């Protein structure tokens, strides 16, 4: 979303407005190069970033991490009087969970809180966030504008990560290889799914290929998963717009990236074999979005039911039976 907004503002900025994109030096070189063709880029590791931070009138971000709104970190008390910006929060994704303990006004002081759905917006207004109706606006996610269609016979499996599998990440490097990963229910479920003979047989029969993409935090565990003639296990960077465009259907669990796929009106199957533990371990609570009644596809709680749903879906050429829910959630699909 940040790149989409930066591109638009750089092209349409009124006189006197100076948009600057902040990024880390460890970002992919092609991403940095692409951003520099759009406008001015500054690295958050540099002192220049802190200068621009103190000069900013507005900070627009899809991240609400502490560094986004406090570049001076532990030196904040010495500079707080120079913090004169309004924080516009684009959201990392659709806010379907209750993040009020984290995103409330007293913690993040969001000036404008962008939303995608009517229920999403109302949950924030009615919840413990303490934002007014005027501060919560429905715009959709900027990245929706970059979505496109190029549908092929491809099944995309894209699950979220698990906070409970703490050995597979750390706070600094994000992703580290964890020897115990193969003993987790998470690994056993998804490795079982991409190697299930009933599913593979149906995909071969119908001419489908599969793509399994791990969350970036679990990326180093790709070597644990068994490849076969149907499924490829992605080993690195994922161009989400490309895989969304090319996939006919998606399997995911709790990832809000499913809303991007649903925006394309393509079918989704949710795999929530660990629902109770997931919400006990994550940093947010269940919110307004009930997958069983609001979700854009069936919810499966075990491997057999997931395979059954996918076999039926592929047998019916991935026809979306949940299109009404999609159209009811999104205010505008253009």
PLM features: residue spans?
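C-terminal alpha-helical cap of glycosyltransferases
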Residues: 333-334
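Conserved catalytic-core segment of nucleotide-activated headgroup transferases in glycan assembly
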Residues: 2-5, 10-13, 137, 141-224, ...
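Catalytic binding pocket for nucleotide-activated donors in carbohydrate/polymer assembly enzymes
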Residues: 223-229, 254-330
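A short, gly/pro- and small-residue-rich
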Residues: 72-93, 173-182, 266-277
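Short glycine-rich, flexible loops that bind phosphorylated cofactors or substrates
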Residues: 67-69, 164, 258-259
């Amino acid at each position: 979303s940040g790149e989409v907004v930066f591109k638009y503002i750089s092209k349409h900025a009124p006189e006197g407005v100076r948009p600057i994109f902040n990024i880390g030096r460890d970002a992919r070189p092609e991403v940095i190069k692409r951003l520099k063709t759009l406008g001015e880029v500054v690295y958050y590791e540099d002192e220049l970033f802190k200068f621009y931070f103190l000069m900013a009138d507005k900070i627009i971000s899809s991240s609400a991490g502490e560094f986004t709104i406090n570049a001076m970190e532990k030196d904040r008390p010495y500079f707080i009087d120079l913090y004169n910006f309004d924080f516009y929060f684009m959201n990392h994704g659709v806010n379907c969970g209750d993040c009020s303990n984290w995103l409330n006004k007293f913690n993040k002081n969001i000036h404008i809180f962008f939303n995608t759905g009517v229920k999403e917006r109302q949950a924030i207004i009615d919840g413990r966030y303490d934002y007014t109706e005027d501060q919560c606006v429905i715009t959709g996610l900027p990245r929706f504008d970059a979505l496109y269609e190029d549908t092929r016979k491809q099944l995309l499996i894209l699950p979220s990560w698990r906070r409970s599998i703490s050995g597979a990440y750390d706070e600094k490097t994000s992703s580290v290889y964890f020897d115990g990963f193969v003993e987790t229910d998470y690994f056993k479920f998804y490795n079982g799914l991409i190697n299930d003979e009933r599913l593979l047989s149906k995909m071969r029969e119908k001419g489908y290929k599969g793509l399994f993409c791990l969350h970036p935090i679990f990326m180093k565990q790709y070597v644990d998963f068994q490849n076969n003639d149907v499924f490829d296990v992605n080993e690195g960077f994922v161009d989400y717009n490309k895989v969304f465009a090319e996939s006919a259907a998606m399997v995911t669990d709790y990832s809000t990236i499913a809303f991007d796929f649903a925006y394309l009106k393509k079918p989704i199957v949710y795999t929530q074999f660990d629902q109770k533990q997931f919400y006990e371990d994550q940093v947010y609570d269940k919110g307004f979005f009930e997958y069983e009644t609001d979700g854009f596809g069936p919810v499966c709680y075990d491997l057999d039911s997931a395979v059954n749903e996918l076999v039926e879906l592929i047998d019916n050429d991935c026809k979306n039976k949940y299109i009404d829910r999609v159209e009811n959630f999104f205010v505008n699909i253009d």
